[in-house]
UniProtKB/Swiss-Prot annotation:
Gene Ontology cellular-component annotations: cytoplasm; nucleus; Rpd3L complex; Rpd3L-Expanded complex
Gene behind the chain: WTM1
Extent of the WD repeats: 103-144, 221-259, 264-304, 326-366
Positions of region (Disordered): 368-404
Keywords associated with the record: Cytoplasm, Meiosis, Nucleus, Phosphoprotein, Repeat, Transcription, Transcription regulation, WD repeat
Phosphoserine found at: 200
GO molecular function: histone binding; transcription corepressor activity
PANTHER family named among the record's database cross-references: WD40 REPEAT FAMILY
Extra information: Present with 7750 molecules/cell in log phase SD medium.
Protein name (Swiss-Prot/TrEMBL): Transcriptional modulator WTM1
Residues bearing PTM Phosphothreonine: 187, 370, 406
Function per UniProt: Transcriptional modulator with roles in meiotic regulation and silencing. Acts either as an adapter to facilitate nuclear import by KAP122 of the RNR2-RNR4 heterodimer, also called beta-beta' subunit, which corresponds to the small subunit of the ribonucleotide reductase (RNR); or as an anchor to retain RNR2-RNR4 in the nucleus.
SUPFAM superfamilies: WD40 repeat-like
Length: 437
């Protein structure tokens, strides 16, 4: 008898949900204490006979990286939410898995799927900031950018991957390295802690002609850690640091930001992502549970608009709208959908995943009104924008907590999200919302 899906008064019913607790060929010790991360393959194979789409989830545990196939029903209008778990992982439940790739001696903290048929298939980052490129059919990395600890490097600052939501205010800087990939996949920017007393650094790295070649190193002054890096297009990217400042850069220009956005209020700026579809929208998340939606064009224009600041005041950079996690649940990750310009999810320190739709806020937004106050998180806007809350279903541990890079949108299949929990439970789901009806 299938277990029933967990329900509450919030929108948490599913169009589809399946989960798998993997078995492994080799014994895996201390599963709960091993770092996990998750992404999807972009390969999708339709099966008209069975009315399914087959793809795969890429899941890391410590130094081992696994590929797990799944099949979900073809996109159809759902008449009602499901009551039971699906069988997307049918045939895999009793299969013992062997690693597809191994980053020996490292703990994988983030992955990005590149191209199954290309020179490189998967890019992974270890928790000390090293990068490794893997190719289909080869178990070990074919390129590596290694980060070694020097005598002046703080072990804590470079190796601690503690959740931002768990850290005291003063210790948030002991967090994270990250990387971003340009839209054409030809350039990578990685962030790196450089030790307690030194600036964090950005490395601009070739991913085309000579994958792994460091093209330039940029210091981010006044910061200990730059925890998030994201590209808006092929050249413009932004970095988010522990001084609560977003810096916007151009890989073609000098080693100084082209403009900045300061966020001194609302707690620590813990997460940031930009839309892969619009190129203008981005979202910031805070340790206090506050979420802000921004228009990059308006925020940049405000830096040169002196109309209301003739005496040297800071730029008036207002977000489009703000939202919040109930109960002050900290924002530990945020990701825009790869298939929709208006949808993103946030991950709370509780492990809950909040699905947001920005259509309501954008319908009230006038980009030409440069001094309009932000749309505050009223009950109406919160209700219309928070479309779904994933608490994980009945199979998830009640002790689950939120971590970066453990949830992901599928890059091709609309509204499909994957997660991995501390106990290795891998789940994929599609929310059931009003749009599903």
């Amino acid at each position: 008898m299938p277990k029933k899906v967990w329900k509450s008064s919030t929108p948490s019913t599913y169009e589809h949900i399946s989960s798998l607790r993997p078995k492994f060929v080799s014994r895996v010790d201390n599963v709960l204490h091993q770092r996990k991360s998750l992404t999807f393959s972009n390969v999708v194979v339709p099966d008209k006979k069975n009315n399914t789409l087959t793809s795969s989830v890429i899941y890391s545990q410590g130094s081992d990286i696994y590929e797990i196939d799944f099949a979900v029903p073809l996109q159809e209008a759902a008449s009602e939410p499901v009551k039971d778990y699906g069988d997307a992982f049918e045939g895999i439940e009793n299969t013992s898995l062997s690693p597809k790739f191994v980053y020996q001696g490292e703990t994988v903290s983030k992955m990005a799927y590149l191209d199954k048929t290309g020179e490189t298939t998967l890019l992974s980052m270890s928790k000390n900031g090293s990068l490794a490129w893997f190719k289909e059919g080869i178990k070990v990395p074919i390129h590596i950018v290694q980060e070694l600890m020097g005598p002046a490097t703080s072990y804590a600052s470079i190796h601690s991957l503690t959740r931002p939501g768990d850290l005291p205010e003063k210790d948030f800087s002991l967090a994270i390295s990250d990387f971003g990939i340009s839209n054409d996949t030809e350039t990578i920017v990685k962030s790196q802690s450089n030790g307690d007393e030194e600036d964090s650094i950005l490395k601009i790295i070739d991913n085309a002609g000579k994958p792994g070649e460091i093209l330039r190193t940029v210091h981010v002054p006044g910061t200990t850690v730059t925890h998030t890096v994201r590209f808006f297009d092929n050249h413009i990217f932004a970095s988010c640091s522990d001084d609560n400042i977003l810096r916007f850069w151009d890989t073609r220009t000098s080693d100084k930001p082209i403009w900045v956005l300061g966020e001194p209020k609302n707690g620590k700026l813990t997460s940031f992502d930009c839309s892969q579809v619009s190129n203008n929208l981005f979202v910031t998340g805070f340790s206090t549970g506050i979420i802000k939606l921004w228009d990059a064009r308006a925020a940049e224009a405000a830096t040169t608009d002196l109309t209301y600041r003739q005496n040297g005041e800071d730029p008036i950079q207002n977000e489009i709208a703000n939202f919040y996690h109930a109960g002050g649940d900290s924002v530990v990750d945020v990701q825009f959908s790869a298939t929709s310009s208006s949808e993103f999810f946030t991950v709370g320190g509780t492990g809950n995943i909040y699905h947001w739709n920005t259509d309501y806020s954008l319908s009230k937004y006038n980009p030409d009104d440069t001094i309009a106050p932000p749309q505050d998180a009223t009950e109406e806007s919160q209700t219309k924008s928070l479309r779904f809350l994933h608490k994980g279903g009945s199979r998830r541990s009640p002790k689950q907590i939120g971590r970066r890079n453990t949830a992901a949108w599928h890059p091709v299949i609309e509204n499909l999200v994957g997660t991995v929990d501390d106990d290795s439970l891998v789940s994929i789901y599609k929310p059931y919302t009003e749009e599903s009806e």
